[in-house]
Amino acid sequence: KAWEYIVAHRDDPYADADMQVSVTPPGKPLGVVDRRGVYLRGTEETHRTTQFLVTVQPSFRAGETKRAYALDVKASLCATQPWVHVPDFLALGSNGRTFEIRVAADTLPPGLHTARVVGRDTERNGTVVFDVPITVVKPVVPSNATYKYPRVRLSSGEIRREFVHVPSGATWADVCVRSMNHEAPNTSVRFWLHMLQLVPQRRLSRVEHHFVLALNENEPMSKRIPVHGGMTLELCAAQFWSNKAGFDLEMDVEFHGLDTVPQVSGHTGQ
C-alpha cells in the first residue's frame, strides 16, 4: 500500500516535501511553539473552549527552489470531531501558513477524547497534505475529598481507565479496592492497578505507582500513594490476560493533605 501510494503521488507538487506542523499554545506569541499537536489534561483547560494557532511550514530539499516557489496548495480543512472548530479552507505556499483552531473541551464528558484536523488537497482527489492530532483528557471533579470509582466488570485482558482531579492541598491518597461477583467462586482474582500523574520537571518513576493485587471475594485492600494537588490523577485497572474468570471491581480514593507552614520565631538571650 505504501509503495502504491508513493507511485500514485510522485508528481504531486509537495511530493517528498516535509510538512512541518507546530502549535502555539494560548497566551504565547506566534512563533513560540513547543508542541506537535494539542494535548489538554488539566481541569481548568478541559472545562473551557481553548484557541490554538497552527502553523504549517513546507520544507523542500536543498536545490528544489523552483518547486518551493511554485507551491500553491488549495487545501480544505476538516475536523474529525464536532467539538473541534476549524476554518473551511487554507491556501498553502512555500512560506507556510497559520490558522486558528478552537477546542471546545467544555462540551465533553469526563474521559479520554481524541480528534484530528486534516488538511486535504482539493485539486488532487482529497489527498491528505497534513494533519494535527488532538487529545483531551478530561478528569472527573469530585464534590468532596472522596472519589468513588464506578463499579466495573473486568474480564481477561480488559483495561479500565478513569481520570480524576486531585483537590488542591492534597498530598496523599488512600486507595481502597474490593472485588465481588467472582465468575469462579471461592477463588482469588489477580489484577494490575496503575496510578499516574504528569508533573512538570518530575521523571515518570517519581509520579507513577503500580501494584499487582490478589483479592479474595469481598475482601478490601488499601494502598497509600503520594499525590500532587490541583493535577489530574489517572487510575487504571487491568486484569491479566492469563486470568479467564471475570469479576466486579469497586474502588474508593480518599484524598488527604498536610502541608507545613514555615514560621519565624525570635528569642532573646543573655
What residue ranges belong to the model's regions?
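Non-catalytic extracellular/lumenal accessory regions of secreted precursors
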Residues: 9-45, 56-66, 119-122, 127-163, ...
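Surface-exposed binding patches on compact interaction domains or structured appendages
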Residues: 16-39, 47-49, 53, 57-102, ...
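Extracellular and analogous surface-interaction loops
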Residues: 44, 161-171, 223-229
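Short, solvent-exposed loop/turn segments enriched in Ser/Thr/Gly
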Residues: 46-54, 95-97, 106-118, 158-160
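C-terminal edge strands of extracellular/lumenal beta-sandwich accessory domains
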Residues: 69-71, 107-108, 118-146, 182-187, ...
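Short proline/glycine- and polar residue-rich coil/turn motifs
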Residues: 88-96, 124, 212-217, 227
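Acidic, Ser/Thr/Pro-rich low-complexity intrinsically disordered segments
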Residues: 153-160, 164-206
